[in-house]
């Protein structure tokens, strides 16, 4: 009887864990309002809301050198709309240029922000992942793919010659174009497992996201 009860409990846990997985549509609906548009002096990128106080995770290269930062929250709009009514001033709180991570904050955040959770679970190779961002001004666009590899202490540079960045990253098939940088890589629960960082110009299926392992360390560091 003990073993049967134990088996029944395990089956219940399995069913609950399976039912908590969201469809692609559900992941987008859960997470899209937790993704922001970040405007700097020289360009734009994506970010992920992680606190009710308006803290946002993004890439360092999205906010690098920007003296003026503004953040737009998700809204229903046409391309002809005046974006200014949706923008909030933001400031940089901390950065880690080596990991290409930044934490910024909306100075006067509105209420009821949709905060995204950061997962502490390392996703296995082959896991389906999701991304929301603003590739080439296609605002709040959704893409999906799979984790191909986890690369510890991966080195990369945005300029020819030299290595500027080192971090544990996920290699995924999820497309990352200009404007996607800084947005969240999400698991099937809609939780953050990485920050989308850059894609290969030579191969569309080689795209890289700084892992949540690095994000958690970054947030914990003083």
Label every model-predicted segment.
Residues 23, 70-75, 146-151:
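Short, well-ordered amphipathic alpha-helices
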Residues 17-19:
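N-terminal signal peptide c-region/cleavage motif recognized by signal peptidases
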Residues 47, 88-90, 145, 183:
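Small-residue-enriched segments and motifs
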Residues 34-35, 43-44, 51-140:
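Conserved active-site neighborhood of the chymotrypsin/trypsin-like protease fold
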Residues 1-9:
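Bacterial N-terminal signal peptides that target proteins for export
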Residues 29-42, 106-115, 141-222:
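Active-site region of chymotrypsin-like
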Residues 21-28:
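Cleaved targeting-peptide boundary
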